[in-house]
Amino acid sequence: DLTNQSVVQVNRLRTTVALSKGKSSAIRFVHKATGKPLFLVYNRLFNRLPTIAQKPDNVIQFASEDRFYIFDAKYRIQFDREYMAQYGGPGPTTEDVNTMHRYRDAIAIPHPMRPQEYLQGVVVGAVVLFPYPHEDMYRSHRFHKSIGQVEIGGLPFLPGATALVAEKIESLLASEFSDLPSSTQ
């Protein structure tokens, strides 16, 4: 169930989506069967870090303030011959995949009881969303397979090419609510 949000605005008879560059927006849901919260946050700023602030485009935050999965839209695709031979076809740039590693390693949150300490490992995975229409062909790509291995990689995401992202989100939800019978998830 949706409990609150700052994304969709209704003014008189007009509905608008309010995603502003550089500004954070959020939707909060509550899982009916468990009461666990789930957040979808656009432009979440992680700025209380011991090093450099991090700001991925989209963050799905599960159940608490300390568990995140990042979906970061990068509107680039790499398809040079050497890349395709090494990774198995067109896909996200290696630079963008490395950014996902950086997010996972760099994002930490302050420890609730010890102000000088940080909880690490709060980002359980991160994927690049990149423009590519051929999802079935991409399934054999190295950066698709790496998601199942290390939870870092890339997924195609375009209008009409959303199945792999939907599968990933369904998988994340199933693992978060794995203690429930599948009919209540």
Indicate residue ranges for each PLM-predicted region:
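Catalytic core segments in nucleotide and nucleic-acid processing enzymes
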Residues: 2-185
